[in-house]
């Protein structure tokens, strides 16, 4: 999981040079981390936070700031509040949701890019990139 997050953050840093999506005032790219820090999937949320912090340390960039918010577990109200807080804080890219149960909710936030770690393939969406490992992708890798 750390390798996926390192690759993602490195890709953003190198491709966009953090200037394209960075806040104009301070030149820093604010990336939201939407993870369940409470409820049934609390351990997953803590693991995602630690993995993201390790990835950020690995790429050693002072121009990327991770802003974590609790999405709760299966709580749409808490989920939407967390997204609004991240957007208000200046995040244009959000890592999350961690599960596929909120894929329909993120369609409302068309100007925000979501990077989901879910292993379920969502229907095509303009603002969702799914980097989870699915059964289909593993079977294709075995075939090749």
Predicted region positions:
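Short, solvent-exposed amphipathic alpha-helices that sit
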Residues: 43-60, 78, 138-141
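Boundary at the C-terminal end of the N-terminal hydrophobic targeting segment
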Residues: 20-24
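Short, well-structured alpha-helical segments in soluble
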Residues: 73-92, 144
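Extracytoplasmic ligand/sensor domains, especially the bilobed periplasmic-binding protein
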Residues: 93-144
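Extracytoplasmic "Venus flytrap"
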Residues: 26, 32-50, 69-71
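Short beta-strand elements in bilobed, periplasmic/extracellular small-molecule ligand-binding domains
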Residues: 58-75, 125-128
């Amino acid at each position: 999981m750390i390798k996926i997050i390192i690759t993602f953050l490195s890709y953003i840093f190198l491709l966009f040079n953090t200037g394209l999506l960075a806040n104009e005032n301070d030149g820093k790219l604010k990336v939201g981390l939407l993870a369940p820090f409470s409820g049934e999937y609390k351990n997953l949320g803590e693991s995602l936070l630690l993995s993201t912090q390790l990835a950020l340390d690995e790429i050693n960039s002072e121009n990327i700031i991770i802003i974590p918010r609790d999405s709760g577990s299966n709580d749409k109200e808490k989920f939407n509040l967390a997204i609004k807080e991240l957007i208000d804080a200046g995040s244009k890219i959000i890592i999350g949701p961690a599960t596929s149960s909120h894929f329909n909710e993120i369609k409302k936030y068309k100007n925000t890019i979501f990077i989901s770690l879910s292993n379920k393939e969502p229907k095509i969406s303009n603002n969702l990139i799914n980097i989870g490992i699915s059964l289909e992708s593993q079977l294709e890798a075995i075939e090749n």
